[in-house]
């Protein structure tokens, strides 16, 4: 009983500390972007199509592949959400191809 009360008290203190000192994590991408969006792939999508037609070439194919740890940038699955780095400082369009 005392152990349970102690654990509950410690968790309560930790929750209060977390509210007072929230941790903000800013994602970092190889292309220098510090922001991202989620894009759910549709049938017929490719990383090239996503980069060029949907994001108007403001991100490279290989930037998307790296952000999602894709071993094969030519293979993406419809219905799968992918992280798209936004506002890249540099664009990698071919090192992974």
Swiss-Prot record:
In its UniProt entry, what is this protein called?
A: Secreted LysM effector Mg1LysM
Q: Name one GO cellular component term.
A: extracellular region
Q: Which CDD domains does the record associate with it? A: LysM
Function description: Secreted effector that enables the plant pathogenic fungus to manipulate host defenses for successful infection. Binds chitin but not cellulose or xylan. Chitin-induced polymerization of homodimers forms a contiguous Mg1LysM highly oligomeric super-complexe that is anchored to the chitin in the fungal cell wall to prevent hydrolysis by host chitinases.
Intrachain disulfide bonds? 31-88, 62-96
* Signal sequence, renumbered to the chain: 1-18
Q: What's in the misc comment field?
A: In plants, chitin acts as a microbe-associated molecular pattern (MAMP) that is recognized by lysin motif (LysM)-containing plant cell surface-localized pattern recognition receptors (PRRs) that activate a plethora of downstream immune responses.
Q: What is the lineage of its organism?
A: Eukaryota, Fungi, Dikarya, Ascomycota, Pezizomycotina
Swiss-Prot/TrEMBL domain comment? The LysM (lysin motif) domains are small globular domains involved in binding chitin in eukaryotes. Mg1LysM contains one LysM domain.
The entry sums up its family as follows: Belongs to the secreted LysM effector family.
Q: How does it assemble?
A: Forms homodimers in a chitin-independent manner through interactions at the N-termini of Mg1LysM monomers. Homodimers are further polymerized in a chitin-dependent manner.
Q: Which UniProt keywords apply?
A: Cell wall, Disulfide bond, Secreted, Signal, Virulence
Annotated chitin binding sites? 44, 48, 74, 76
Source organism per UniProt: Zymoseptoria tritici (strain CBS 115943 / IPO323) (Speckled leaf blotch fungus)
């Amino acid at each position: 009983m005392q152990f349970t009360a102690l654990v509950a008290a410690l968790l309560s203190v930790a929750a209060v500390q977390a509210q007072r000192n929230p941790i903000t994590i800013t994602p970092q991408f190889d292309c220098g972007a510090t922001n991202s969006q989620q894009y759910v792939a549709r049938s017929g999508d490719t990383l090239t199509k996503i980069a060029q037609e949907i994001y108007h070439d403001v991100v490279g194919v290989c930037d998307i592949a790296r952000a999602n740890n894709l071993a094969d940038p030519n293979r993406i699955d419809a219905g799968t959400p992918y992280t798209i780095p936004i506002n890249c400082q540099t664009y990698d369009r071919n090192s992974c191809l």
